[in-house]
């Protein structure tokens, strides 16, 4: 809606970048393919993609943040740990800050999750379970993060009119 591009056209154009993100679990490794997809298929200016995509690969870790929040609450519930509302708010704020600092590489969220798990008072054994399922979750989360970066490019294309 904001980017004035049909969702079908958008997803068809970005499919190579989304699949690469899913397969590599790396926002950073997907930067060249992401730029190519939105520049060639969707007509976004290089001036926009040169800033938006690398910045998004670095700080746009929204899916990782959501995933870590759910995982903390899941493990707390599984371990019969009562997490108060005030602790949830603290974990949420720390999660937002940690997700911005999470590197866009495979397994980059493991250290952030360890910090959050410690804050929530989870036992150390939770880390083994988290690490064992992290790759499966990371594939989807990275794909969502990259799609968000590319959607931002399309929206900026419509909102910022550049003279080429």
Where are these regions (language model features)?
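A short, ordered amphipathic alpha-helix with a cationic face
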Residues: 6-7, 24, 102-103
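Alpha-helical structural context
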Residues: 1-2, 41, 78, 119
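Membrane-interacting alpha-helical segments
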Residues: 12-15, 19, 23, 137, ...
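Transmembrane alpha-helical segments and their short flanking loops
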Residues: 69-164
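Signature of multi-pass transmembrane helix bundles
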Residues: 1-10
């Amino acid at each position: 809606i904001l980017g004035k591009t049909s969702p079908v056209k958008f997803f068809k154009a970005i499919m190579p970048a989304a699949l690469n993100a899913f397969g590599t679990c790396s926002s950073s490794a997907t930067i060249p393919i992401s730029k190519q997809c939105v520049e060639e298929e969707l007509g976004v200016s290089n001036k926009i993609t040169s800033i938006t995509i690398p910045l998004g690969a670095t700080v746009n870790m929204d899916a990782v943040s959501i995933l870590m929040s759910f995982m903390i609450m899941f493990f707390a519930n599984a371990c019969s740990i009562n997490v108060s509302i005030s602790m949830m708010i603290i974990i949420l704020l720390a999660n937002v800050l940690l997700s911005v600092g999470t590197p866009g590489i495979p397994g980059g969220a493991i250290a952030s999750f360890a910090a959050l798990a410690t804050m929530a008072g989870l036992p150390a054994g939770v880390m083994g379970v988290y690490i064992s399922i992290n790759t499966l979750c990371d594939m989807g989360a990275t794909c969502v993060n990259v799609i968000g970066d590319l959607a931002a490019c399309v929206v900026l294309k419509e909102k910022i009119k550049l003279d080429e």
